[in-house]
């Protein structure tokens, strides 16, 4: 277990929990110091055994499980903080490890929280008793003897209050030591077991890809496989200053390149593969961008840059020291050593899911979860089955290409991504349908579409005051009657008086010549507005009097395409937001 330094207690006591960070408290029910120390040693040894036996191939997304034995407020215990990064599965893998270790050490009580608080209760929100929720669950949720338990208040208290207050750390430790009111819910534990049933097999999920990288990187990864995540994160969160290191590549230069298999996790591979970047100066990529060599070279370039950024980062001095220590261990792998590594490319089709397919996959997953939950309910919530049931290899571990080249995958993806004439017509049709649907919405409750009956006293008095001021300012001016329905009809061109009139008859005047009398009705106001708006549009679009529907569609698509091309990131900005809301996927290739 890693040492967290002398400030572990200060960080644990802090109310601020960083994003993607989980905190762990492990207390023991023994009252004698010698017995507690023995239980601590046994618990840490069991965690180490579990990781060696079940997670030997696991690659941590950010930090590995960090725990430290401390004496806190006169009580020997284990405290820990781990930042699991972007991989939520790492957090649940930690939960699985702690749950399994608690089975071996019966006196252990484990608490784990993150920025959401008691996230174990969030997972089992539908199964909680009425007297506990997220507001009063502090220090009440623990893992003990392989089960999630809740520190329950006294029955007399619940009869009076119907819900329990949150606990302090001291109160929770006292109740743990006494062993009283430990509430266990089969439904809560079933929900947690459902979430954990894919472990430990899911902990060893990996994705292998062929990359062209410096020989030094192969050597470093052979010494510590978890440095792959540090390098990918360094490239993924790079800034313009970091990219200056990539233009020099002083540590991982491109003079000694090898093509070999690199092991990622699916998440790390997706983060690296989908990162967009320029071709940095030290790199000479193949000219054929659709070739297999280009794919391997561009992936290797990104990984090499990640290691270069990691090595030069002032925030990761310990990583620099670690890399230097590995590189001092000679010799580097020879060409014969590299040839012994089998060239394997795992399936990456999981990244080629369009939005429509994603909804279908999520629905299938939800239905599968509901079926599993129903089976468990009918079987009496057999927790033993949950603990020992693992997700099949074919579900969790990406399979091999089976001889299929990356070129075929690239061609298939580009066929999905390129826009053609029918795609453009479909896009225009969806936008037109959306506008027509919005324009024809007659199901309104009032002018603003909402009822404003629930206004407070201050708002009412303010409104009355405004009305009085308005009336005083407009004394002597005739009241203008406002017909809301007629106003909407005028906006939509449905008013019989003007529906068949040619708009051209209003185009002769300009803004300076308009004279709206004080007693004008709403129709005259609308005529004046039409005249002003039409005159401005006519002057701006003088050469487009003969525009037809096809020209409108063409102009619409022209503006959309120009907006896409002007946006450096196709997955952000107003055009992308508009098209995504209409379920129109933007191609990666312009």
Curated annotation (Swiss-Prot):
Region (Disordered): 445-464
Positions with biased composition (Acidic residues): 455-464
InterPro entries: Ecd
Gene Ontology annotations of biological process type: mRNA cis splicing, via spliceosome
Main location as per UniProt: cytoplasm
Entry keywords, A to Z: Cytoplasm, Nucleus, Transcription, Transcription regulation
Annotated localization: Cytoplasm; Nucleus
Molecular functions per Gene Ontology: snRNP binding
A GO CC term attached to the entry: nucleus
Pfam families: SGT1
Function: Involved in the regulation of carbohydrate metabolism. May act as a transcription factor.
Family: Belongs to the ECD family.
Protein name from the UniProt record: Protein ecdysoneless homolog
This protein's encoding gene: sgt1
């Amino acid at each position: 277990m890693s040492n967290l330094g002398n400030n572990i207690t200060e960080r644990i006591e802090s109310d601020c929990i960083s994003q993607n960070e989980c905190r762990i408290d492990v207390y023991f029910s023994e009252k004698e110091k010698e017995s507690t120390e023995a239980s601590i040693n046994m618990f840490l040894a069991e965690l180490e055994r579990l990781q060696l036996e079940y997670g030997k191939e696991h690659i941590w997304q950010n930090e590995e499980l960090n725990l430290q034995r401390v004496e806190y407020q006169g009580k020997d215990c284990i405290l820990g903080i781990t930042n699991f990064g972007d991989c939520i599965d790492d957090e649940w893998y930690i939960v699985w490890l702690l749950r399994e270790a608690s089975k071996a050490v019966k006196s252990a009580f484990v608490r784990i929280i993150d920025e959401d608080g008691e996230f174990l209760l969030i997972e089992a929100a539908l199964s909680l008793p009425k007297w506990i929720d997220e507001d009063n669950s502090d220090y009440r949720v623990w893992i003990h003897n392989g089960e999630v338990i809740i520190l329950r208040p006294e029955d007399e208290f619940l009869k009076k209050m119907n819900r329990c207050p949150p606990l302090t750390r001291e109160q929770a430790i006292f109740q743990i030591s006494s062993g009283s009111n430990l509430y266990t819910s089969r439904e809560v534990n079933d929900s947690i077991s459902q979430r954990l049933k894919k472990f430990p097999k899911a902990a060893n999920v990996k994705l292998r890809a062929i990359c062209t990288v410096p020989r030094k990187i192969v050597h470093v990864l052979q010494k510590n496989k978890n440095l792959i995540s540090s390098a990918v994160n360094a490239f993924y969160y790079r800034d313009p200053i970091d990219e200056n290191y990539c233009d020099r590549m002083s540590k991982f230069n491109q003079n000694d390149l090898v093509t070999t298999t690199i092991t990622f996790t699916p998440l790390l591979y997706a983060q690296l593969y989908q990162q967009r970047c320029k071709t940095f100066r030290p790199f000479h990529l193949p000219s054929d961008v659709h070739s297999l060599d280009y794919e391997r070279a561009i992936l290797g370039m990104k990984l090499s840059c990640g290691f270069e950024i990691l090595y030069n980062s002032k925030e990761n001095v310990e990583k620099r020291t670690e890399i230097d220590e590995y590189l001092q261990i000679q010799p580097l792998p020879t060409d014969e050593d590299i040839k012994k590594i089998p060239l394997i490319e795992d399936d990456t089709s999981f990244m080629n899911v369009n939005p429509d397919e994603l909804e279908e996959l999520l629905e299938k997953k939800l239905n599968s979860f509901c079926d599993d939950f129903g089976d468990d309910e009918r079987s009496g919530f057999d927790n033993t089955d949950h603990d020992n049931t693992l997700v099949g290899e074919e579900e969790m571990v990406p399979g091999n290409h089976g001889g299929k080249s990356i070129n075929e995958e690239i061609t298939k993806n580009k066929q999905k991504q390129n826009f053609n004439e029918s795609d453009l017509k479909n896009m225009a049709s969806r936008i037109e349908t959306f506008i027509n649907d919005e324009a024809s919405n007659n199901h309104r409750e009032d002018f603003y579409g909402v009822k404003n009956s629930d206004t407070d006293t201050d708002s009412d008095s303010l409104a009355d005051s405004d009305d009085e001021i308005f009336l005083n300012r407009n004394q002597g001016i005739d009241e203008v009657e406002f017909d809301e329905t007629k106003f909407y009809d005028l906006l939509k061109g449905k008013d019989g008086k003007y529906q068949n009139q040619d708009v051209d008859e209003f185009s002769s005047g300009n803004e300076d010549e308009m004279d709206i009398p004080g007693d004008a009705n709403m129709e005259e106001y609308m005529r004046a507005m039409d005249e002003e708006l039409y005159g401005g549009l006519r002057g701006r679009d003088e050469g487009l009097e003969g525009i037809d529907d096809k020209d409108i569609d063409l102009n619409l698509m022209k503006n959309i395409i120009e907006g896409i091309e002007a946006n450096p990131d196709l997955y952000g900005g107003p055009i992308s937001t508009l098209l995504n809301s209409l379920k129109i996927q933007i191609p990666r290739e312009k």
